[in-house]
Amino acid sequence: MKKLFYMPLLAVLLGFASCQFFETDPDNVLNEDQYIAKESEMYRGFLGIITRMQEAGDHAIFLTDPRSNYMETTGNAPIALQNLYRYESTDGNEYADPRPYYALIVSCNDFMTKLDDFYQRVDGALSDSAKVHIPRLVSSALRHKVWGYYMLGRIYGEAYWYDTNMTELDNLDNDKVFTKLDMKGICDYCIDLLDNGVELCGQRIPANLEMDWTYWVNPMGGNAAYKYWNLMTPRWINLRAELASWRTNYEDEAAARADWQWVRDNVLRYLTESMVNGGHWYSCTMQIILEYPNIFWTEQVAYEPQIMGAVFYDYQNKQTNRLVQYFCPEYPADGYYLKPAEKALEIYTEADIRGPKQRLVCNTLGGQLAFSKYYYTRLNNQGYLRQNIFEIQPTIPLFRGHDLHFLLAEAENHLGHWDVAKTLLNTGLLNRFPGGRLTLPADSLDGQAIWSEYYWADESVNWFAPAGGYGDIGIVGANRGKEYDLPVISDDATDAEKLAFAYDKDRIKAYDLALADEYLKEFTGEGKSYSYLVKMAERYGKDYKIVFDRVKAKYADASQVEASLQEKYFIDWTLE
């Protein structure tokens, strides 16, 4: 009989004095009867969710990146990690256990249930600040829950959905508690939660509210030193758009088009409006070339104009991840389990800021090739993030600005806007329209403008950055990468020919696979690239070769890899 593994429903007690806010003490926890008994414990309960996020933060990296194109195991690697790399059975492999994601979901459900119980118990008699914060805490918990299910879906292809707070073992066969979902079902359930929120604490709470922790620390004017806390929760737009892009794989043409239209309109609007914040927030500009290492080489805020949700750690407070241990050849204990594969490095040009020549993502340390972007930088002779290597606990990004550009290009492609998609992927609007032309092409397709007005919002804020900022130079351009030679059609073609080309399935697939190839270059060691290939395989007739053709080069003998992928490319795990 299948049972869901039991997760202790205890929020870790977190210190509240300034920088001790995230201090954990595993021997001093709130038991079920005490949690939540007063307003201050609302915040402690929510930070219990963050503790679960810290536990899940590096899970996808070590589970999926060894199966993607970039990483290979070293002779030091544990046997279980080597087995993942060799595409042997994942069922029962310790790295493949989905426990961290279910623990997070349990924590979110429990927090929301206990918060509602507390609200009912005090009959809504709360301080003014609590009345403001409760909806934002619930909204944040909803997004953490959705992120947990999103990760389960993209890694395992299935999940058990439940909304109750688990206090004891329960049979997975109990359909009154659990609903087993495939990836389409996960997308549907998560999107419904993101769109409609939840009825809790006497009100309908949407899923897109943000908690401003700076004003919780200092209600009188905020405290900028704690601004990075606002990045603890993934953004609504990232989750909603990612899930929609996956859902299109399983929909009919009309429904898929509606989802692509949603992604295009909402991501484009979000990106354009974000430029108001500083001229280049979440954009692909020259600024990325200058600041790219700072997205990763950090233990705190990272490069804030690019980060859209992250997991933070603090060695002094015993909050640790395994990144440096697994990637660094000079780690002063057992470690250095994964390194860049030589064949993977061949896909980068010499100028590409992510390639081996530039030494911003990988480097030679202690005489060994190392994946170094999280903990070491050659810029300004800075070297390691800390003098004591074992103390380095890098920030793990959940989403960043690049994610939205890939989603936008993907959506424009499927809507037939091939010129826009190609421009976003390659060298951007600034190069497509030299001089920042004031009028975008008026071309239309099926009565819709191909170039949305949001690419030119107004004279001070747009993708050309005429007010002195940096304009859009594309995903490839912002990394000094190699442009993709994609199919196009002549301006002299007839309208009928242009229409047919726009919706040609082979053209759309060619553009999608170019995005996938660039995605592999961009998201190394972030627990994302393998799942992106799986998304494309699902989209195009469950074609395992989309994955296989991109990972096989690093293997001397790829026969086991092909056999495994042919059987199943989602990670296999049997819940008991």
Model region roles, listed by residue range:
Residues 1-30:
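Bacterial Sec-dependent N-terminal signal peptides
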Residues 19-71, 267-268, 545-547, 551-576:
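Membrane-proximal, proline-rich intrinsically disordered regions
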Residues 33, 60-74, 163-165, 206-234, ...:
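Short, surface-exposed recognition loops and adjoining beta-strand edges that mediate ligand/DNA contacts
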Residues 43-44, 78-157, 174-188, 196-203, ...:
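Conserved, well-structured interaction surfaces
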Residues 46, 203, 265-438, 444-451, ...:
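Elongated scaffold/linker segments in the mid-to-C-terminal portions of large proteins
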Residues 108, 187, 194, 260, ...:
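Inward-facing hydrophobic residues that define packing positions of alpha-helical scaffold repeats
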